[in-house]
Amino acid sequence: MNKYASEHKEIPGNPSTAKSSSKKLNDRQNRSPLRVLTEKQWSFWVQKGYIVIKKAIPKKQAEATATFLWEFEEKNPKDVSTWYKPPRAEMQMKELAGTGMVEVYNNQYLWDNRQTQKVYDAFVDVWGTEKLWVTIDRANLNFPIKKGFEYKGFIHWDYDPETKPQNVQGVIALSDQTDINMGGFQCIPWLFQNYDLWKLGQPEDRNRFQPDISGIEKYIEKVAMEAGDLLIFNSLLPHGIRPNLSKDKVRIAQYISMMPAEED
């Protein structure tokens, strides 16, 4: 019997992470050497709750995946008039409508990225085990905001943080996202670090998945990435997709995660 325990049924973010692992994240007590992360990166990961692994997949591989996503959505990267047509598949999670989610999961391009050695090794580092399962996640084409296609972005958890979930999530950049105005990953490491203190000032009936960030907006970090980079983050880190405020740049990404395999 699978030992993963479902912490909640309705989540405001990624549905593939609705289950928390029964195994804990790597604390390095076994002193196994890191495969990808440096000691400096490890310290950053522990403190901030996220880390960017540069060139996790080859840039050409990222570009090929991006090209596939454009074709799958029947949109033309050089023709803005095609960008705002309805997506091929309706979003079941209405709070993600307008964020550019692409409902594709099992194409070979996506599997090539999931099976890239450096991607796997990075997840081995954060979990401390070689026996991992990969999640089957969607992708993202986040277009510039325009009238009728607004999206404010929201900070959330995919778990109730009170349950202290053991899980990580991740995203591979399929296009350069060095312009922080063009959308992409944002998070609040301060809240990751100070959650227990922060919650003392919050009402008991607060939304457990979408924190009130009034007064702590200044702590939001907007993470820049280049095509081929992998970002892994702790599920206790509040995060979200920032709105694309650029004129004509598209944020393209693939969601990915791995978790310890469970024996039957």
Regions found by a protein language model. Give the residues of each.
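Double-stranded beta-helix
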Residues: 73, 77, 177-242, 259-264
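Non-heme Fe(II)-dependent double-stranded beta-helix
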Residues: 2-47, 54-162
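Short acidic/polar capping segments at secondary-structure boundaries
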Residues: 139-147, 160, 174-179, 190-194
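Short beta-strand segments enriched in hydrophobic/aromatic residues
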Residues: 174, 237, 258-260
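A short hydrophobic beta-strand segment most commonly corresponding to one strand
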Residues: 170, 249-263
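Secondary-structure boundary elements
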Residues: 125-133, 162-165, 173-181, 194
